[in-house]
């Protein structure tokens, strides 16, 4: 099946706010390295940072509410380490088409597979995926469904089978029940993520909190799909390698939660601890994450390519 590729819809190129946000993020030079395009009938927005056709390829899924342009320094830096890097704006997020914030985990898995169909026409592989925050859950779900993904790096992995505490579990149950009656009712993101506090001290904090491309309100059916998804890694070992990248000062989920996830899941998970850093480290310290992610992916891809030769 041929997947349609179209030019991107970069809707804010002449916007003063967009220019100011990029300046505060200091990403103007990194954006010169990207090639943007849309994939499929759902117009999935992708941003490619190419290294070479025979280099390994990493797909990136951003954190909740956000989109991949905000992570340009991270994606460009990772590419310069020897990888083709492709950021995907989730359906209804950033520059991707669709009702704002509206997707299911299954739809995102399909979107990742469509993008892989396109990438395979240009790049030899191997292919890995890096998901940050809620993007980590989506990355893991995508790898469970698509065996082309041989390495999965999760920036703080939420596994809904394992609630951090009873308050989370009650909230998820409420979300599920409410979504049956009011699936399109939107819940403010600030009810469970305080961007202003998490980005405290970042030069672009105010701009990010006012960015029209960020999703600040989520339909209940999206939240229900995310927080009630059942990860297959809980009861099954997959062929892909996997790791959790977690700051020891994480304000959203404590480091102890990742240790619980590792002991609960049948899937082997490596833990990479980011010392003295919190949840927003990919935006706050992108160069640090570039080094850690590049080292891990290089190790996994090298093993895979060595095994392929034997």
Regions found by a protein language model. Give the residues of each.
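An N-terminal hydrophobic leader/cap segment in hydrolases
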Residues: 1-38, 43-49
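Active-site glycine-rich loops that stabilize anionic/oxyanionic intermediates
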Residues: 55, 63-66, 248
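Catalytic nucleophile-loop/oxyanion-hole region of alpha/beta-hydrolase
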Residues: 65-67, 94-123
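Conserved alpha/beta-hydrolase
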Residues: 68, 75-99
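Short alpha-helix in the alpha/beta-hydrolase fold that links the catalytic acid
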Residues: 74, 240, 254-263
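Alpha/beta-hydrolase-fold enzymes
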Residues: 132-212, 216-217
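Short beta-strand/loop motif that positions the catalytic acidic residue
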Residues: 238, 244-246, 250
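Catalytic histidine-centered segment of alpha/beta-hydrolase-like enzymes
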Residues: 277-290
């Amino acid at each position: 099946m041929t997947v349609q590729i179209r030019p991107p819809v970069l809707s804010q190129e002449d916007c003063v706010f967009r220019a100011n946000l990029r300046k505060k993020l200091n990403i103007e030079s990194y954006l010169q390295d990207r090639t943007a395009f849309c994939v499929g009938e759902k117009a999935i927005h992708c941003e490619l940072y190419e290294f070479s056709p025979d280099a390994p390829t990493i797909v990136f899924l951003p954190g909740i509410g956000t989109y991949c342009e905000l992570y340009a320094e991270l994606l460009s830096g990772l590419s310069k380490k020897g990888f083709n890097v492709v950021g995907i704006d989730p359906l209804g997020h950033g520059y991707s088409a669709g009702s704002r914030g509206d997707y299911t985990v299954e739809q995102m898995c399909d979107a990742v597979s469509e993008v892989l169909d396109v990438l395979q026409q240009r790049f030899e592989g191997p292919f890995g995926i890096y998901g940050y925050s809620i993007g980590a859950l989506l990355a893991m779900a995508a790898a469970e469904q698509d065996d082309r993904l041989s390495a999965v790096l999760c920036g703080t992995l939420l596994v809904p089978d394992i609630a951090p505490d009873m308050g989370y579990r009650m909230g998820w149950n409420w979300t599920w029940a409410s979504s049956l009656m009011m699936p399109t009712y939107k819940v403010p993101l600030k009810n469970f993520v305080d961007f202003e506090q998490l980005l405290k001290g970042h030069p672009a904090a105010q701009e990010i909190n006012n960015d029209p491309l960020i999703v600040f309100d989520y339909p209940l059916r999206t939240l229900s799909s995310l927080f009630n998804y059942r990860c297959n890694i809980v009861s099954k070992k997959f062929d892909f390698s996997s790791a959790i990248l977690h700051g020891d000062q994480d304000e959203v989920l404590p480091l102890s939660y990742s240790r619980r996830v590792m002991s609960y899941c049948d899937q082997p998970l490596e833990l990479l601890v980011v010392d003295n850093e919190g949840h927003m480290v990919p935006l706050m310290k992108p160069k640090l994450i570039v080094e850690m992610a590049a080292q891990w992916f290089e190790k996994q891809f090298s093993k895979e390519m060595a095994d392929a030769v034997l």
